[in-house]
UniProtKB/Swiss-Prot annotation:
Native source species: Syntrophus aciditrophicus (strain SB)
Name the UniProt record assigns to this protein: Peptide chain release factor 1
Post-translational note: Methylated by PrmC. Methylation increases the termination efficiency of RF1.
Name of the gene encoding the protein in the UniProt record: prfA
Location in or out of the cell: Cytoplasm
One matching Pfam family: RF-1
Length: 357
């Protein structure tokens, strides 16, 4: 591990020289490439340098223990346990930073939220979750744009909402939100006060570049239709809404939020490209079977990653066993504690796989 860290530090120093080289500065694309690599290595190099500094302090304390000065020996005895603990923490941090980086972490994302089991309640919770993610994005100063929304009949909920979220590190922060989110609450229409359980599926997909995912126009069937709002009423009189079917995979994407057919088509193609990239990534991870379903599940209540219990004001993430009694704040976008816990959990899992592999 430490020979690898020395190599990384050497490369970091080399990049610092390159970034001050006038011949590099004048070549914008090359400069940006080196600047990004330099930024990617910064955390690792800084932690490694702290590790070396603490290691040197431990060596110095051990030398004092071998000396004759009792006062200095006492100081060294007091400092050593804390220094060793600090060193162990830095070593664990280095192991995490050396893990293979997810190349999608810096990408923008598409967020898909769909109603599963639970009827009207599931549709209402689609809206609740969308507002939660939109508020979280707002806190991060990310940009949220609704690509498509399909209202459900009756109570003002949604069958589906698709949105793009653009901002630094969007995928790295949101990628573990994919799965089934379960809600337990008493519906407004429930006269007996019984708690109902509903489910909503969330999918987080990294945005794909056109170069990465090329789509043959001959593989597409494009249909146009009238946009409709709640209850099916027409919201404009032209065929501006677009439905694109990718014939080889059967994937279907609809977009009707823009008044322009061309804009709706462009947005739908972006979502389709992200879905196709999502499938490609899963194939590379040996998760070929039912690629979309493997991320979000079927929408059945039993396949849950997180439960939102309204009567108790409780939210539990079942993957990490974390329960927070701050439902209102969480639905208001305060989800960072879950995100940090999930990131640490999956990093630990990756470390386990490396040590056993």
């Amino acid at each position: 591990m430490f020979s690898k860290l020395k190599e990384v530090e050497s490369r970091y120093l080399e990049l610092e020289k390159l970034l001050s080289d006038p011949t590099v500065v004048t070549r914008q694309s090359l400069y940006q490439k080196y600047a990004k690599e330099h930024a990617d290595l910064r955390d690792l190099v800084e932690v490694f340098r702290k590790y070396e500094k603490v290691g040197a302090a431990i060596e110095e304390a051990q030398q004092l223990l071998r000396g004759d000065d009792e006062e200095l020996k006492e100081i060294a005895r007091e400092e050593l346990p804390e220094l060793r603990q600090h060193l162990a923490g830095l070593e664990e941090r280095l192991k995490v930073l050396l893990l293979p980086r997810d190349l999608n972490d810096d990408r923008n994302v598409f967020l898909e939220i769909r109603a599963g089991t639970g009827g009207d309640e599931a549709g209402l919770f689609v809206g609740d979750l969308f507002r939660m993610y939109a508020r979280y994005a707002e806190m991060r100063r990310w940009k949220v744009e609704v690509i498509s929304s399909t209202p459900s009949s009756g109570v003002g909920g949604f069958k589906e909402i698709i949105a793009s979220i653009a901002g630094q590190g969007a995928y790295s922060q949101l990628k573990y939100e994919s799965g089934v989110h379960r809600v337990q609450r008493v519906p407004v229409t429930e006269a007996q006060g019984r708690i109902h359980t509903s489910a909503v599926t969330v999918a987080i997909m990294p945005e794909a570049d056109e170069v990465e995912v090329t789509i043959d126009p001959n593989d597409l069937r494009i249909d146009v239709f009238h946009s409709s709002g709640h209850g099916g009423q027409s919201v404009n009189t032209t065929d501006s809404a677009v439905r694109i079917t990718h014939l080889p995979t059967g994937l279907v994407v609809s977009c009707q939020d823009e008044k322009s057919q061309l804009k709706n088509k462009a947005k739908a193609l972006k979502v389709l490209r992200a879905r196709l990239l999502d499938i490609m990534v899963k194939k590379q991870s040996d998760e070929i079977s039912e690629a979309r379903k493997s991320q979000v599940g079927s929408g059945d209540r039993s396949e849950r990653i997180r439960t939102y219990n309204f009567p108790q004001g409780r939210v539990t993430d079942h993957r990490v066993g974390l329960t927070l009694y701050s439902l209102e704040n969480i639905l208001g976008g305060d989800i960072q504690e879950f995100i940090d816990a999930l990131t640490a959990y999956f990093q630990a899992e990756s470390l386990k796989q490396q040590s056993t592999g």
